[in-house]
Amino acid sequence: MARAVGIDLGTTNSVVSVLEGGEPTVIANAEGARTTPSVVAFTKDGEVLVGETAKRQNVTNVDRTISSVKRHMGTDWTVGIDDKKYTSQELSARILGKLKRDAEQYLGDSVTDAVITVPAYFNDAERQATKEAGEIAGLNVLRIINEPTAAALAYGLDRGKEDELILVFDLGGGTFDVSLLEVGKDDDFSTIQVRSTAGDNRLGGDDWDQRIVDHLVKRFKESTGVDVSNDKIAKQRLKEAAEQAKKELSSSTSTSIQLPYLSLTENGPANLDETLTRAKFEELTNDLLERTRKPFEDVIREAGVSVGDVAHVVLVGGSTRMPAVVDLVKKLTGGKEPNKGVNPDEVVAVGAALQAGVLKGERKDVLLIDVTPLSLGIETKGGIMTKLIERNTAIPTKRSETFTTADDNQPSVAIQVFQGEREFTRDNKNLGTFELTGIAPAPRGIPQVEVTFDIDANGIVHVSAKDKGTGKEQSMTITGGSSLGKEDIERMVREAEEHAAEDKTRREQAEVRNNAEQLAYSIDKLIKENDDKLPEDVKSEVQGDVDGLKSALAGDDEDAVKTAFDKLSASQTKLGEAIYAQGQQEQAAGETPEGASEAKKDDEDIVDAEVVDEDDEDKKTDR
């Protein structure tokens, strides 16, 4: 039976998890690690590498190695490799495809369904692009859920029997979210409802790394006079060193960064040898840390609670291991110690697997209620953003509002859909436009156009407009900035499946050949063993088909092998019929008078017995 998995598609690393016996298990990849780098590399000989093997290409193959793709989801960003442009969806699909294969190898079963997580603050275009990436990878995306929600799902189910507020502080490689969730507990059922969420999709661990890189570039120029800011290979080496330094500074107060032969000068190779203290690192990145403060405060304010009402604080994402982040969270929550019982790299995937289990009926003890992170509305006269659905509204949801025309005899209205919190549409994200035509001529203000927003459980928006006078209706599903039509997705799915299809064809051809060789051998043997029992015409016909199949097997024409195989499969039944008929004739010939005499002689030794009641004094036995 095909299995469903939960996938955390991260900026830096990705994780896949599955329910086994109702409990989540993180699946190790083919390399034995529980996290897979979200990196794709194209080698010069045409091979596509994903994960750790791709990450190792970062320095030697810098122009053909792509990382942090998640930051480009929902945009028209592309990268060119060998005269072919790849979208963020296609590259993300490569990562998802590896996770899918690794899960299938671990489970020994096919994986078709998945719940994929996204940052809570992802807009509609970014969510749609994530769903498309899953489809390209050959996955049926059961649900797109928010990362903090998934983390709370994984964390909250095992915590006591009381109703509690859980605050999730999620700082990943490329995105940042804060969510406040309420976990309601009954005896055997839990309801997890998102109360509010806020974040910054352009803030993550990559930005902390970049500050170290900028610092090292500056120090290297000061000490050697060489500016490596435009040297791609040097910058990549610095980036890897910066990431490692950041990790080391989480447990040490200083770290040494040594990069020999980083560049060349007139006097020979120039080496980098720097010591970075935690204090200096925190000074370099203090403004980044401060950017996490406002979303935290917004979430508390919009939920209408005080910090003291929060029962648990959960840190999610590898970047929350930085001591400065932990200290800030403690300060913001009034000294509350963040929970240390969850793995920040894995908890989101675990929650996604639990949600997959809920959707597939494997877990029936939890209900998840998420929210839309940004307000949705349309543009009305003057470029005003008229909101139909406010941010932090529970989803799925549906809202309608009636609008009218701005001019006399206006024959149509353009419905421009926006997402965001600003008062004017020009400052918000344009999700798309469609036109409702055929409005009956009438003075301005008379026609009534009902606009309906419908947000599904994935957070994806559907919009419709209906003229109440004529009954005419127009609708659209927002695809935002992903720029992928149905044909594009189908083409990418075909390309992603191309190699798998080739392998499948080769395997099927090999199976046909194996079956054909086995059939030819077994029929050949059957004919030889029953040579005297087979009529010449049957034997000649079937032997001819055997020889024909052997001849086809000697060649490379797979269609000829299949045709010859089918022909012999049909004609071989005549052998069975002939052998069975011969056996019946021999049996009939064997019923001779001598045989009857022998039967009579044998019968003399048979006792005929009549069974009667034991109490019957007249019981008798005839011999």
Curated annotation (Swiss-Prot):
Record-level Gene Ontology MF annotations: ATP binding; ATP-dependent protein folding chaperone; unfolded protein binding
Region of interest called Disordered, as start-end residue ranges on this chain: 580-623
Induction: By stress conditions e.g. heat shock.
Keyword ATP-binding among UniProt keywords: yes
Record-linked SUPFAM superfamilies: Actin-like ATPase domain, Heat shock protein 70kD (HSP70), C-terminal subdomain, Heat shock protein 70kD (HSP70), peptide-binding domain
Biased composition (Acidic residues): 604-617
Low complexity bias (residue ranges): 580-596
Modified residues (Phosphothreonine): 175
Pfam families the record matches: HSP70 (PF00012)
This protein's UniProt keywords: ATP-binding, Chaperone, Nucleotide-binding, Phosphoprotein, Stress response
Family statement: Belongs to the heat shock protein 70 family.
PANTHER family: HEAT SHOCK PROTEIN 70KDA
Job description of the protein: Acts as a chaperone.
HAMAP family registered for this protein in UniProt: DnaK
Stated name of the protein: Chaperone protein DnaK
Native source species: Clavibacter michiganensis subsp. michiganensis (strain NCPPB 382)
Gene that encodes it: dnaK
